[in-house]
Amino acid sequence: MSERKYFGTDGIRGKVGSSPITPDFVLKLGWAAGKVLARHGSRKIIIGKDTRISGYMLESALEAGLAAAGLSAAFTGPMPTPAVAYLTRTFRAEAGIVISASHNPYYDNGIKFFSIDGTKLPDEVEAAIEAELDKPLTCVESAELGKASRIVDAAGRYIEFCKSTFPNALSLSGLKIVADCANGATYHIAPNVLRELGAEVITIGTSPDGMNINKECGATDVRALQARVVAENADLGMAFDGDGDRLIMVDHRGDKVDGDQILYIVAREALRQGKLHGGVVGTLMSNMGLELALKQLGIPFARAKVGDRYVLETMQEKGWRMGAENSGHVIILDQTTTGDGIVAGLQVLAAMARNHMSLTDLCSGMTLLPQVLVNVRFAGQCDPLQDTAVQHSCAEVERQLAGRGRVLLRKSGTEPLIRVMVEGEDLQQVTDLANTIADAVKAAS
């Protein structure tokens, strides 16, 4: 397939006010998507958003474009990305659209689409939408224009769905949990789910103002959560990102529990329950410690390219039901169709309750190898990965690791960054080697 002009690995994303995240482009995008999606029968689209101030502007633009193409929009208001996927399925809508830039700062935003079955749009549908964007906008006849409505009980519907993934025979009674909602889309969802299941809940990151999403909080910055868990003598902490599709946890000691460890816990529990179908999928970034721990359990493991859509594709290719990224995207197809931070967290909590074990104990069967990730910003027109000095630097680092570690360089799918990852047995060595490669990348940028 030819290279796409606008769609990246997770929809369309950028800085608000700069192409392509402008009101006029998003209106045209709504129209183009409407033209393509209307061919498939249904005429309703679910639109959700996170808590960014630009969400108001962009949802209005999307709705106008969809209406011009003859499709109606149903707004959920601030709602986690996986909630939009769920509501798209239950309403039998033709598609769901999420206005979010996930873990990015408030001044970024993006648009991503879900199919009628709650999975991300196939590449060929995204390509068809891009093809329509090159055509002049034409409006349907007045009698065929789309309408707008609001799903007033969207939050309640999703809360009940999340609770339904937690066994009826279990309770969270007696657990003290700190929930960090990143001032994002889970702020009015996650605390209610946990409280209704019996937990004592302390919240941070639940006062969104349109500009504080992901700011020093949430899954990408758990320092405040770690401190609060220890200060409150809580049993654990749960950190979601801005749109609620990621989860990072913190144990009672304040130690971080990442997506690799969460995947290990839920996979081992599924194995114990006789509900693990085949193996599990990680990514090129997944820690070697995960692979070794799963091997000890006899659980097959495969690595996909980085990106939750590629994890899901590999799961589907192999017929497996579980996968994750170490960043906290955890996909459990027996429960939902996409990464869902709340649902993933509930499966960990169920394992704790069922086995009468702490989060620390559940992690004890897996030892993470030291892994250092350095992000290097680069100018869009250059490609540091093709630079001879960078390639020589990587080769030298691999020689020093002598087969007892890994080196991975890749471009981010959502930002102009080169991600440098080095993994090995000694943290200081790994840190030094990662910085050596990062310096070479900077020089080439």
From Swiss-Prot:
**Details of cofactor binding:** Binds 1 Mg(2+) ion per subunit.
The answer to whether the entry has keyword Acyltransferase is no
Record keywords: Isomerase, Magnesium, Metal-binding, Phosphoprotein
EC number(s) from the headed UniProt entry: 5.4.2.10
Q: Which InterPro entries does the entry link to?
A: A-D-PHexomutase_a/b/a-I, A-D-PHexomutase_a/b/a-I/II/III, A-D-PHexomutase_a/b/a-II, A-D-PHexomutase_a/b/a-III, A-D-PHexomutase_C, A-D-PHexomutase_C_sf, A-D-PHexomutase_CS, Alpha-D-phosphohexomutase_SF
Q: Name one GO cellular component term.
A: cytosol
Kindly identify the residues recorded as the active site: S102
Q: Where does Mg(2+) bind?
A: S102, D241, D243, D245
**Cofactor(s) for this UniProt protein:** Mg(2+)
User: Which one of the record's GO molecular function terms can you name?
Assistant: phosphomannomutase activity
SUPFAM superfamilies, alphabetized:
Phosphoglucomutase, C-terminal domain, Phosphoglucomutase, first 3 domains
From its record, what is one biological process in GO terms? carbohydrate metabolic process
Which residues does this entry mark as bearing Phosphoserine?
S102
Q: What is catalyzed by this enzyme? A: alpha-D-glucosamine 1-phosphate = D-glucosamine 6-phosphate
Kindly provide the PTM information from the record. Answer: Activated by phosphorylation.
Q: Which family does it belong to?
A: Belongs to the phosphohexose mutase family.
Matches recorded under HAMAP family: GlmM_B
Job of this protein: Catalyzes the conversion of glucosamine-6-phosphate to glucosamine-1-phosphate.
Q: What is this protein called?
A: Phosphoglucosamine mutase
